[in-house]
Regions:
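Conserved functional hotspots at enzyme active or ligand-binding sites that engage polyanionic ligands
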Residues: 1-108
Length: 108
């Protein structure tokens, strides 16, 4: 599991406004942590692109349909939630945008 890879992940159970159901998510934790720990940090991806907020990263042609990475939906999960192999890997220019969105959302 590597930073920037996109996996289908089962985010249930969820509470309130947390991203839910099975959805693609991008791994944002560092590779050394991904190798050593039983968890990874991910950011949820949605195909609801009606509004793009400053903490979102638009993905026009990365998945089957236009989508966005939602940096406000970041969480650490068990690797057991990952459903199969990665479906793609975000290119470095998009990962830089994800990093910027995370910095904005987390005030880093």
């Amino acid at each position: 599991m590597n930073r920037g890879e996109v996996y289908w992940i089962d985010l249930e159970p969820s509470v309130g406004s947390e991203a839910n159901k099975r959805r693609p998510c991008v791994i944002v934790s560092r590779d050394a942590s991904n190798r050593a720990a039983a968890t990874v940090t991910i950011v949820a991806i949605t195909s609801n692109v009606r509004r793009i907020y400053p903490f979102d990263v638009y993905l026009e042609a990365v998945l089957d349909k236009p989508s966005k990475v939602q940096a406000n939906q970041v969480r650490t999960i068990s690797k057991e939630r990952l459903l199969g192999p990665p479906v793609t890997r975000l290119p470095s220019d998009l990962m830089k945008q994800v990093d910027a969105a995370l910095r904005l959302h987390l005030a880093l």
